[in-house]
Design a protein with these regions (language model features):
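Thiamine diphosphate
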Residues: 1-156, 160-161, 170-175, 181
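Glycine-rich phosphate/diphosphate-binding loop of Rossmann-like nucleotide-binding domains
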Residues: 186
Length: 186
């Protein structure tokens, strides 16, 4: 899903000179292509997630379209206060991408696992939460998120990268994804 996500982000950045990607020393393999095409718009702040959020907030206040990326527990749990105070209370158009939801990185231990992220993010003000489950949904989410001018949080799984749905499905922000129309509830 990360590579689908990045390809959509590259398409967007090609048309939008204010699009920036900020990472905290992660995502090199996934974002190598973005960094090569847009070296001046790819920022690595080092292992400093709180500063990453602060930098992103400052950039957004100057009109930049900022995407921040890290492993999910790092970008969310370590930076929650900065996300809440700097991004959400100012309703800044920043997209927070957390990779490896759930137990995707279980080999690295408890510091890399997340099972609480959806409940935490859903309780925060001014935040749209996306949780794609396939490559198709990841592509759909990027396009929905780009139309959304408010803060967004995207939970990307590490694997599997397979599609479950028909590619002709359509979805709008804050609406469910209708798989099949029917008259009975199961």
């Amino acid at each position: 899903m990360r590579f689908i996500f990045v390809n959509e982000l590259i398409k967007f950045a090609s048309k939008n000179k204010n699009a920036y990607l900020v990472t905290s020393d992660l995502g090199y393999r996934a974002f190598e292509k973005f960094a090569k095409i847009f070296p001046q718009r790819f920022l690595n702040v080092g292992v400093s997630e709180n500063n990453m959020i602060g930098v992103a907030a400052g950039m957004a206040m100057t009109g930049k379209k900022v995407f921040v990326y890290s492993i999910l527990p790092f970008v969310l749990f370590r930076s929650l206060e900065q996300i809440r105070n700097n991004i959400l209370h100012n309703n800044l158009d920043i997209k927070i991408i957390g990779a490896g939801g759930g137990f995707s990185y279980n080999v690295q231990g408890i510091s890399h696992n997340t099972s609480e992220d959806i409940s935490i993010t859903r309780s925060l003000p001014n935040l749209s939460v996306y949780n794609p489950g396939s490559r198709f949904e990841a592509k759909l989410v990027v396009n929905l998120m780009l139309k959304n001018k408010t803060p967004c949080f995207v939970r990307l799984g590490k694997a599997p990268d397979r599609d479950f749905y028909n590619k002709n499905l359509r979805c709008k922000n804050n609406e469910g994804l209708i798989l099949t129309k029917g008259k009975e509830l199961t």
